[in-house]
From Swiss-Prot:
Keyword Glycosyltransferase: no
Alphabetical list of PANTHER family matching this protein: FLAGELLAR HOOK PROTEIN FLGE, FLAGELLAR PROTEIN
Family annotation (PROSITE patterns): FLAGELLA_BB_ROD (PS00588)
UniProt-recorded name of the protein: Flagellar hook protein FlgE
GO cellular component, one term: cytosol
Keywords annotated in UniProt: Bacterial flagellum
């Protein structure tokens, strides 16, 4: 009967508009929900089957809710470093629990990017869903996204990130060495010619200074030693001979063979003088050390002569440890180092003007006590050479190498491997002291890459800058998420460490997803399966840090929908009342 179908059509209109009202109400209620996607009710006709000759029967209307999940919401700035929004396609991957995840655990997808740290340090949004991503390798620190393997995703946790320290591996020095720096006495040889006096200053045990004239003579030897060159030696102070003797050199090796010094008022002493022959021709010799008595002639007095610079026995490192020993450097550069534990060490580059106009002796040393096997802290020694225009002869090198000098300090407790004879056991390399308990450290010292590098000009010796990497120990102060989805830990020593990368899931039909509690969605047959991607890769949207995606609800549109829905509902109710009145009239016929 057509009247009955009209009444049923009115009922369907009430139902459809009730559904539309529900969708509008849901939209209005979530106008401030982060990442909420509005929905609407679409109406479609219902047709009663029949032919054209039959009386028309109303079919009514059907409402179907449609979600605009793929619609982009406006981006709103926030003050939280953990707030993120997606600009473009994709969803955050989340789980309901943070740990012990398996492939069968349900994954939810959301655009709600307001995350906070829970009590265990996991990133969780306001709905209690845990953010998933690719974690950094604990050893290398590298993050390698693998979109093909769901189990590579894990809940992002920053609670396990402790303090950090990075050891120094590179050093750049910018300094100038004075080109007219006088050659130190410990470097210059005291040269004398046979028959001519050579001045030698010595200090006795009572710190009395004596100035001796040493005269060599190649004549007057009655019984010269076969194969050797012998010289008579006269040692005078203030014109008075205090000792006489002779020295003999091997003609082939130029090494001192023997020396006999006759002190006035004392018995002769054999082998108490050390000299070095400079010229193999036999006319020029050098007196480096004198083991002689003081001017009074007392044979039990101790006299110490000035020694020549020798990095292995009489070095600048020795002087740094004990000022009464070794050779005082002409210039030093302090280089700060961070060890593997974040401890702050200092390596000193000491330099001594060499005998050549463009030559300097150099030593690298640690603080005495920082090394286990070198009491004076010496690490490395060598020579620095410059060109005539004041540049390093070998660009970037320290000791004449063609590349930046590398020093290696072995770890605390290092034990050198033994070799099998006849192989010779190499010297033990510099090693950190056992008490420090720190790792091996290799440091590249570059003297050219730093601005200006190391130069030798006729101006004051000065350090312009020393640049190093590495940091002291630092505590975690902040967490940030950048445009690439990298979650980074920031420490108070200036170090930033990436700990994870946020994963983005995309769908071929995101509007086919099924909504669940917490402003999240689940996979359906209509949506298709998801594809994991890094932000801004493969069609995935980019992340916007410190922002949130606003709800896509437009209140003006929703209120307009309320009016039309209310009118439609009222009109549908009129259909029912009208049909009812017509049926009433039909019943009145019988009266």
């Amino acid at each position: 009967m057509s009247i009955n179908s009209a009444m049923l059509a009115g009922v369907s209109g009430l139902i459809a508009n009730s559904s539309a009202l529900a969708a509008i109400s849901d939209n209005i209620a979530n106008v401030n929900t982060v990442g909420f996607k509005r929905s609407t009710s679409n109406f479609s006709t219902l047709v009663t089957s029949g032919n054209k000759n039959q009386t028309y029967s109303a079919g009514g209307v059907k409402a179907q809710t449609h979600q605009f999940i793929s619609q982009q919401g406006l981006t709103q700035s926030t003050t939280s470093n953990l707030d993120i929004s997606i600009s473009g396609a994709g969803f955050f991957v989340t789980t309901e629990k943070p740990e012990n995840l398996t492939a069968t655990d349900t994954r939810s997808f959301t655009r709600a990017g307001s995350f906070q740290l829970d009590n265990l340090g996991y990133l969780r949004n306001d709905a209690g869903l845990y953010l998933q991503g690719w974690l950094a390798d604990p050893v290398s620190g590298l993050i390698t996204p693998d979109p093909s393997d769901l189990m590579q995703l894990a809940s992002i946790n920053v609670g396990s990130v402790g303090g950090t320290a990075e050891k120094t591996t590179r050093v750049g020095v910018n300094a100038n060495l004075r080109s007219e720096q006088p050659v130190a006495a410990a470097v210059s040889y005291k040269v004398g010619t046979a028959g001519s006096p050579s001045k030698t200053n010595v200090v006795d045990s009572a710190t009395n200074s004596h100035n001796y004239d040493v005269v060599y003579s190649s004549t007057g030897i009655a019984n010269p030693v076969s194969g050797n060159n012998e010289y008579l030696v006269d040692i005078k102070e203030n014109g008075v001979i205090v000792a006489t003797g002779k020295v003999a050199y091997d003609a082939a090796t130029n090494e001192l063979v023997s020396s006999t010094i006759d002190y006035k008022g004392a018995s002769p002493v054999t082998g108490s003088m050390t000299t070095t022959r400079i010229n193999a021709a036999g006319t020029t010799v050098n007196l480096a050390d004198l083991g002689i008595v003081n001017a009074s002639g007392a044979d039990d007095a101790e006299v110490v002569a000035g020694k020549l610079y020798d990095p292995s026995t009489w070095s600048m490192s020795d002087y740094a440890k004990d000022n009464s020993k070794g050779v005082k450097p002409d210039f030093e550069v302090q280089i700060p180092l961070s060890d593997s534990k974040g401890g702050q060490r200092t390596v000193t580059l000491s330099m001594l003007k060499g005998p050549g106009p463009n030559q300097w002796y150099a030593e690298l040393r640690a603080k005495p006590g920082d090394l286990a096997n070198n009491g004076n802290g010496q690490i490395s020694t060598g020579i620095i050479e410059f060109t005539t225009d004041g540049k390093l002869k070998n660009t970037g090198s320290l000791f004449g190498t063609t590349s930046p000098t590398a020093i290696t300090i072995k770890s605390s407790g290092y034990i050198a491997p033994t070799v099998t004879p006849p192989a010779v056991q190499p010297p033990t390399p510099p090693t950190w002291a056992d008490a420090l308990g720190i790792d091996e450290q290799e440091v590249q010292i570059d003297l050219a890459s730093a601005a200006g590098g190391l130069t030798q000009y006729n101006s004051q010796s000065v350090v312009q800058s020393v640049n190093t990497n590495g940091t002291a120990f630092g505590n975690l102060t902040n967490i940030e998420i950048d445009e690439g989805g990298y979650v980074s830990a920031i420490f108070d020593n200036g170090v930033t460490r990436r700990i994870a990368q946020v994963a983005i899931a995309t769908f071929s039909n995101p509007n086919g997803l099924k909504g669940v509690n917490g402003n999240a969605y689940r996979v359906t047959n209509e949506s298709g399966t998801y594809s994991l991607k890094a932000p801004s890769q493969g069609g995935a949207g980019a992340l916007a840090p410190s922002t949130l995606e606003a709800s896509t609800v437009d209140l003006s549109q929703e209120f307009t929908g309320l009016i039309t829905t209310q009118r439609a509902y009222s009109a549908s109710s009129k259909i029912i009342t009208t049909a009812d009145q017509m049926l009433e009239e039909l019943l009145n016929i019988k009266r």
